[in-house]
């Protein structure tokens, strides 16, 4: 049985057609499809982590690859250019069709002061660098591990030279983030969102009688914990496609993406009843406010 290491669904046995399938899937960087593979990318959090590790490792020798841990629990190998305490890492987004940060360069340089510092090109919101909690923990974990391995007692400064320019193509300014990109990542991997991915996930989901259609990783984790009888799948905004599944379904997600599906926040309950599906809306990360809409069966 071949299990995806990120979303923990099983792949159809008939799709496993070559010897490399298991190795590729277990790397986290490949999603097996009916006729081949889709490539996952790495998040800005993983890219920043790789830059920090490479900068430290390069104090010993020139470095071209490093292995970093991810929030999903899968170690990933990343190509780098690093020498004498300075590293450059190019983010790649796999087969994602519209990731504007694809190809952006992260730089990391060692410094005497212990700790992790974020420089130019990393956005700021309310006086704080725009680094998500999960990404910050990932970078810190890899920094500590590399520091111990190479007996390093200093710090690392991470910057994104083109961050401010690339950020203009994102929605950062609308949410109050200025001066650069955000450093994010709840799994460490970028899902290769495209039509083929949605079709592939739906085919995989057909193996299960009950599925939880989730809007993202946090909703996936919530569904996995609260509804263990349902196999969770991340479908993002592609909820209508997922509803084609003929078995029992629930939708679990945060209001931001659910209102896109419904047309507005006020219509979430109405859409649930129209589709005859239960919708669980998570209002915040602390699970202190959840509202549950029971759709009427057709």
Curated annotation (Swiss-Prot):
Primary enzyme class: transferase
Q: Which organism is it from?
A: Archaeoglobus fulgidus (strain ATCC 49558 / DSM 4304 / JCM 9628 / NBRC 100126 / VC-16)
Recite the lineage of the species: Archaea, Methanobacteriati, Methanobacteriota, Archaeoglobi, Archaeoglobales
Q: Can you state which reaction this protein catalyses?
A: Co-precorrin-5B + S-adenosyl-L-methionine = Co-precorrin-6A + S-adenosyl-L-homocysteine
Q: Which spans are transmembrane here? A: none
Task: Give the record's family classification.
Answer: Belongs to the CbiD family.
Instruction: Give the InterPro entries listed for this entry.
Output: CbiD, CbiD_sf
One Pfam family of this chain: CbiD
Specify the protein name: Cobalt-precorrin-5B C(1)-methyltransferase
GO terms for MF: cobalt-precorrin-5B C1-methyltransferase activity
Annotated metabolic or biological route of this protein: Cofactor biosynthesis; adenosylcobalamin biosynthesis; cob(II)yrinate a,c-diamide from sirohydrochlorin (anaerobic route): step 6/10
This protein's UniProt keywords: Cobalamin biosynthesis, Methyltransferase, S-adenosyl-L-methionine, Transferase
List GO BP terms, alphabetically: anaerobic cobalamin biosynthetic process; methylation
Q: What is its EC number?
A: 2.1.1.195
Note the superkingdom of the native organism.
Archaea
């Amino acid at each position: 049985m071949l299990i995806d290491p990120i979303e923990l669904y099983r792949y159809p046995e008939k799709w496993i057609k070559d010897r490399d399938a298991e190795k590729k899937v277990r790397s986290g960087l490949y999603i097996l499809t009916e006729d081949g593979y889709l490539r996952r990318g790495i998040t800005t959090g993983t890219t920043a982590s790789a830059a920090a590790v490479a900068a430290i490792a390069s104090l010993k020798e020139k470095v071209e690859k490093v292995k970093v841990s991810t929030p999903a629990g899968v170690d990933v190998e990343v190509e780098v250019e690093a020498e004498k305490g300075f590293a450059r890492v190019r983010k790649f987004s796999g087969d994602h069709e519209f990731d504007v940060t694809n190809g952006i360069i992260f730089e990391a340089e060692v410094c005497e002061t212990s700790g992790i510092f974020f420089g130019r090109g990393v956005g700021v919101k309310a006086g704080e660098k725009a680094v998500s909690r999960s990404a910050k923990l990932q970078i810190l974990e890899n920094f500590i591990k590399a520091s111990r391995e190479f007996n390093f007692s200093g710090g690392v400064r991470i910057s994104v030279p083109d961050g401010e320019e690339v950020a203009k193509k994102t929605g950062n300014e609308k949410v109050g983030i200025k001066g650069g990109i955000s450093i994010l990542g709840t799994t460490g991997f970028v899902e290769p969102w495209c039509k083929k991915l949605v079709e592939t996930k739906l085919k995989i989901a057909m193996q299960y009688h009950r599925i939880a259609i989730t809007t993202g990783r946090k909703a996936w984790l919530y569904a996995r914990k609260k509804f263990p009888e349902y196999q969770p799948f991340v479908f993002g905004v592609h909820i209508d496609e997922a509803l084609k599944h003929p078995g029992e379904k629930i939708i679990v997600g945060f209001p931001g993406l659910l209102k896109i599906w419904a047309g507005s926040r006020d219509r979430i309950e109405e859409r649930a009843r129209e589709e005859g599906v239960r919708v669980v809306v998570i209002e915040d990360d602390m699970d202190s406010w959840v509202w549950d809409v029971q759709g009427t069966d057709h």
